[in-house]
Each structure stands twice: as structure tokens, then as C-alpha cells.
């Protein structure tokens, strides 16, 4: 008995000694003294769509992050939490330092860049100078095309360069200005970088940047100082925060040497000697994963840090650390709605439609002025149309903007100007309808200067149940279930007979047995299993290499 007790006591002493040397990580708990701290929400998902559905059904202000699991396999799991709780663990836990912000589709966002080139393939390239010239060029484009004033002091400059690769992230911190979404950011950059893209298509080797011991030959003069005018290259200047170029004139003017800026410094070579742009134009896609400040790619040691030549400094606060301020500034989709916020748009060059699109009826027909389509929630669009189609007035949706952090849809209304503040219609100023999907309410605001000065906001009115997110998700799930039941029913009646949709494709009998549907289900199930295994083996399991306490043990201790 004594021996057992002594052995037990020894185990306890060893465990106590271990935790004295390596104490358990503290747990995030919002404090009453800081009411701005959100409640704890920490959910992991194997699929990105599941994570976004949870965010949309959650009342709290939560966001989606992607976490790399294993080296080389590209698998990621998705974390949903608040910025505050994420930063609480992120700043101290090594197994979280391979994270990405998921930039939500259709969400208002900041202007951002991913810059890189191979150092051995470009021995004369001066990366710092290239970044400075690019920032100056983009600032001039923003000023001429949109009337937005900015400088290098408004650009957060992050670096993760190695001996092999120069790598930077730039995130513009524009004052009361953001882009409609990252697709519009990509359109804007493709237009202003067209002269550099033209160089890539040139067969003349002389057009490629020559490298010398002092850098590229064109570094002596910034392109923004060469007398170049964007208004000449792009035939229409910004009107009401949007602009569209005439493609024929663009080609004609783009071919004129005197009207094109010298962007040869943006053309670099890869390790195969092929030309490509210093600016990665592939990062402006739906639900893009963009690496976080202080994160490295899994298997790599170099994280994104603030550069020595960074000129942006966040506003200091007594309650918030500088590091947390930099983190919040680095988030591309961290944009809040305000009455003074301007939304910039840019349509692709091949789009011949001009102007802002608005819906002219509750039906499906769309009258296009600028080429915008439905919001992410068409049911909400139709509800808003019902609000502005009454009393003999046929109002429309001039445009919409989606603010992901608040799950807020902001509709600019046209042809309907009735304002609750003055009890009548404005003579010349339009109104806005704002739909708060988290709180399931809608309200009206104004573009009228007097209403803006009063910070007018109408009473909140409840949304109809059929346009609330929980109802929409339930309806979607029921539709998916019914579709699956119908498929199983058809297979039960005659498992060897192809459905009409399959017959319409002209598939043979052999093709029916190997039509790819079972394979799709099999691949999906396999992917789920692999993701679950990856999550279990990497993020959720004990990592002996970094010698951290596993999440399960923390939860077990808290429960005890």
C-alpha cells in the first residue's frame, strides 16, 4: 500500500514539476472590465463552406481563418473565431503560426498586393526600390482615377524574404475608402498594370529588364513622375466611385509609347528564365486564403513581419498593443461600414456594359447601368425591392455592398427617395436600405447632407422569416436532402436504369455503370476522411516538436 502511495506521489510531483517548467496556456476569458471583448467562440471545420455557414448563422462578430495541416499536402482546416480570441492564442501558440485569412467572396475589402521574385534569377533587382516605385505608381492611379489621396505612409509593408526569394505583402490603409470586393481589386490592378502585361507578351528581348550591379536601368525616375496621365490612358475618369475604360481606345492609347508609363521594373524572371510580373495577379479570387501577419508557410521558418522600410504606423491606444493593431491592419477584409465610407469599383475591360446595375422589378429581369448582378442573397434583394416598389413608384437597387464582419448588406436605392427623417421624399438625394442579417432587422439611412449631419438612422424593422439566414440555410438543407432522397428512390426502383438526365447525355450502358457520380461521392468521403485525419494528427493532437500542451488536455483540466 505504501509503495503504491509513494509511486502515486512521485507521479504527482513529476507532473507538478513539469507544469512549473512549462505551465498550461492561459485560456481566453472576456472580462467584465472590458465590455468590448467578445465571448469565446472557437470552432473547427473540415470544409470552408461549413465554416462560412456557421459564421452567417452566428450572432457574434466571427471570422474564418485557414490553418495548414501537413507539409506538402496542401490540406487546410478552417477555424471560426473572433479577432480578439484568435489573437489571444495566436501570439503565444506555435502550432497556430501557419494561418491564412479567408477573404470572403463579395465582401468589401482593402487594396492588397502579393509581391515576389526569385533573387538568383534577378541578381540586379533592387526589391525595396521596386516596392517604393510600385506604391508611388498605385497612389497616383488612385488619385487620378478615383480622387483618393494616399502615400507610402498609408501602406502596411510586410516582408517574408529569404536568400532565394524576395517576398512582400502590401495592404493599403485608405482613409474611408475600400473596394467592393477583391475581384474589383484585381480588375483595377490589371488595368493600371496593362503596360507591364504588354511587356510580357513582347517577343523583343530588349523589352525585358536588364540587370546591372546597381539595379534596373529605369529606377532613376519613378513612373509617376514621367508626365504620364491615367486620364489619357483610361478614357473615362471615375464618376461616383467607379470607372470603366473603353477597350478600343485603351488598346489604341496603350500602344502609343508617349502615353504609356514605363513599368519595365515590374517585369522579372523566374528560375527558368521566363518573364512574369513582380505583382502576383492570381491572389484576387473568391474566398482567397491570404497569409497572416507573423505566419509562415508550413515547413518554412520565415514569417511575415513588418519591414524596416515600412512607413505605416497604426494609431496607438492604451488598451491595445501595437502588435495587435498591426494584426488588425493587416486583415484585408477588416472593413467596417460607415456613412463616410466610399466604395471603389472597377469592371473588367471585356465587359461592355457600363454603369451601375439595378433591379427594376421584383421579378428576375435586370436593367443594367453598370453591370452589377445579384447580391449573395437574392431573396433579400427581392425583399428590398418590395420595400421600394409601392405607392405607384417603381424604385430599384442601384448597387449593393456586402460587409462581411457585420453580415451587413447596404443597398443604394434609385427612383425611390422617401425618407423617414423628413416624412417625405427627398427632391434630389437618394436613400439607402441596410439589412442587418445577424440581428435580422432592416433600416433606412440617407445620402442627404442634412440627414448625414444628424447621423440619421430610421427605426429598425424585423426581417420576414423567409429572408432570415437560419430559414435560408434550413431551406437549402431540405432541398439538398430531398434531392438526395429522390436520387436514392430512383436507384431503389431500378438501380441499373439511368435517370432521364443521364439518358439525355447519350451515355452508353457501360457509361451508366461508370458515370462518375459514385466516384464523386467516394472522392468526397475520402477527402473528408483525410481532412479529419490531418486535423487530428496535426492541429488537435499533441505536438512533441514544439512541446506544447494539447487542446484536449486543456479542456480536460478546465472541466475538472
Curated annotation (Swiss-Prot):
Signal peptide: none annotated. Changing residue 89 to D: In MYP22; reduced DNA polymerase and DNA primase activities; reduced DNA-binding. Changing residue 426 to Y: In mutant CH; abolished DNA primase activity and impaired ability to restart stalled forks. Its main location: nucleus. Mn(2+) binds at residues 114, 116. Residues 1-22 form a coiled coil. The modification Phosphoserine is found at residue 255. Can act both with Mn(2+) and Mg(2+) as cofactor in vitro, but Mn(2+) is the preferred cofactor in vivo. The polymerase activity incorporates correct dNTPs with much higher efficiency with Mn(2+) than with Mg(2+). The fidelity is slightly more accurate when Mg(2+) is the cofactor compared to Mn(2+). In the presence of Mn(2+), a conformational transition step from non-productive to productive PRIMPOL:DNA complexes limits the enzymatic turnover, whereas in the presence of Mg(2+), the chemical step becomes rate limiting. Residues 481-560 are annotated as: Interaction with RPA1. A motif (RPA1-binding motif 2) lies at residues 548-556. It comes from the Eukaryota. It is an enzyme of class 2 (transferase). The zinc knuckle motif binds zinc and is required for the DNA primase activity. It facilitates the binding and selection of the 5'-nucleotide of the newly synthesized primer and the recognition of preferred initiation sites. The RPA1-binding motifs (RBM) mediate interaction with RPA1 and are essential for recruitment to chromatin. The interaction is primarily mediated by RPA1-binding motif 1, which binds to the basic cleft of RPA1, with motif 2 plays a supporting role in RPA1-binding. DNA primase and DNA polymerase required to tolerate replication-stalling lesions by bypassing them. Required to facilitate mitochondrial and nuclear replication fork progression by initiating de novo DNA synthesis using dNTPs and acting as an error-prone DNA polymerase able to bypass certain DNA lesions. Shows a high capacity to tolerate DNA damage lesions such as 8oxoG and abasic sites in DNA. Interacts with RPA1; leading to recruitment to chromatin and stimulate DNA primase activity. Interacts with SSBP1. Interacts with POLDIP2; leading to enhance DNA polymerase activity. It is linked to Myopia 22, autosomal dominant: A refractive error of the eye, in which parallel rays from a distant object come to focus in front of the retina, vision being better for near objects than for far. This is DNA-directed primase/polymerase protein. The lineage of its organism: Eukaryota, Metazoa, Chordata, Craniata, Vertebrata.
Amino acid at each position: 500500500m505504501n509503495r503504491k502511495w509513494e509511486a502515486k506521489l512521485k507521479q504527482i510531483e513529476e507532473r507538478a514539476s513539469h507544469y512549473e517548467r512549462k505551465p498550461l496556456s492561459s485560456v481566453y476569458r472576456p472580462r467584465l472590465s472590458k465590455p468590448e471583448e467578445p465571448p469565446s467562440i472557437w470552432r473547427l471545420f473540415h470544409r470552408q463552406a461549413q465554416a462560412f455557414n456557421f459564421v452567417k448563422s452566428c450572432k457574434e462578430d466571427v471570422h474564418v481563418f485557414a490553418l495548414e495541416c501537413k507539409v506538402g499536402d496542401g490540406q487546410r482546416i478552417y477555424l471560426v473565431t473572433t479577432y480578439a480570441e484568435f489573437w489571444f492564442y495566436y501570439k503565444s501558440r506555435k502550432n497556430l503560426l501557419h494561418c491564412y485569412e479567408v477573404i470572403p467572396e463579395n465582401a468589401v475589402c482593402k487594396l492588397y498586393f502579393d509581391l515576389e521574385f526569385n533573387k538568383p534569377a534577378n541578381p540586379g533587382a533592387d526589391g525595396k526600390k521596386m516596392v517604393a516605385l510600385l506604391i508611388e505608381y498605385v497612389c497616383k492611379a488612385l488619385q487620378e482615377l478615383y480622387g483618393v489621396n494616399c502615400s507610402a505612409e498609408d501602406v502596411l509593408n510586410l516582408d517574408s524574404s529569404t536568400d532565394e526569394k524576395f517576398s512582400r505583402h502590401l495592404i493599403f490603409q485608405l482613409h474611408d475608402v475600400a473596394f467592393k470586393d477583391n475581384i474589383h481589386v484585381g480588375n483595377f490592378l490589371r488595368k493600371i498594370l496593362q503596360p507591364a502585361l504588354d511587356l510580357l507578351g513582347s517577343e523583343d528581348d530588349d523589352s525585358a529588364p536588364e540587370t546591372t550591379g546597381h539595379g534596373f536601368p529605369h529606377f532613376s525616375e519613378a513612373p509617376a513622375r514621367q508626365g504620364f496621365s491615367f486620364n489619357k490612358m483610361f478614357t473615362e475618369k471615375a464618376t461616383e466611385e467607379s470607372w470603366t475604360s473603353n477597350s478600343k481606345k485603351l488598346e489604341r492609347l496603350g500602344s502609343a509609347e508617349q502615353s504609356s508609363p514605363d513599368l519595365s521594373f515590374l517585369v522579372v524572371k523566374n528560375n527558368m528564365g521566363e518573364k512574369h510580373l513582380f505583382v502576383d495577379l492570381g491572389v484576387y479570387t473568391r474566398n482567397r486564403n491570404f497569409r497572416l501577419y507573423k505566419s509562415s508557410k508550413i515547413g518554412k521558418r520565415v514569417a511575415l513581419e513588418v519591414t524596416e522600410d515600412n512607413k505605416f504606423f497604426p494609431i496607438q491606444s492604451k488598451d491595445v498593443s501595437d502588435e495587435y493593431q498591426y494584426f488588425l491592419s493587416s486583415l484585408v477584409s477588416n472593413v467596417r461600414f460607415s456613412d463616410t465610407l466610399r466604395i471603389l469599383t472597377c469592371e473588367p475591360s471585356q465587359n461592355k456594359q457600363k454603369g451601375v446595375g439595378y433591379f427594376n422589378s421584383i421579378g428576375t429581369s435586370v436593367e443594367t447601368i453598370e453591370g452589377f448582378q445579384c447580391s449573395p442573397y437574392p431573396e433579400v434583394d427581392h425583399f428590398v425591392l418590395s420595400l421600394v416598389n409601392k405607392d405607384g413608384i417603381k424604385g430599384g437597387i442601384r448597387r449593393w455592398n456586402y460587409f462581411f464582419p457585420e453580415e451587413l448588406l447596404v443597398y443604394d436605392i434609385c427612383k425611390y427617395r422617401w425618407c423617414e427623417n423628413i416624412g417625405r421624399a427627398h427632391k434630389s438625394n437618394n436613400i439607402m436600405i441596410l439589412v442587418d442579417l445577424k440581428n435580422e432587422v432592416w433600416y433606412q439611412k440617407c445620402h442627404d447632407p442634412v440627414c448625414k449631419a444628424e447621423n440619421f438612422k430610421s427605426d429598425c424593422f424585423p426581417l420576414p422569416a423567409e429572408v432570415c439566414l437560419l430559414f435560408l440555410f434550413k431551406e437549402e438543407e431540405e432541398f439538398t436532402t430531398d434531392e438526395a432522397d429522390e436520387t436514392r428512390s430512383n436507384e431503389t426502383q431500378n438501380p441499373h436504369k439511368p435517370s432521364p438526365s443521364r439518358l439525355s447525355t447519350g451515355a452508353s450502358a457501360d457509361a451508366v455503370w461508370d458515370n462518375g457520380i459514385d466516384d464523386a461521392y467516394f472522392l468526397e468521403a475520402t477527402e473528408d476522411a483525410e481532412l479529419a485525419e490531418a486535423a487530428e494528427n496535426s492541429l488537435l493532437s499533441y505536438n512533441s516538436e514544439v512541446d506544447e500542451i494539447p487542446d484536449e488536455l486543456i479542456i480536460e483540466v478546465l472541466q475538472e
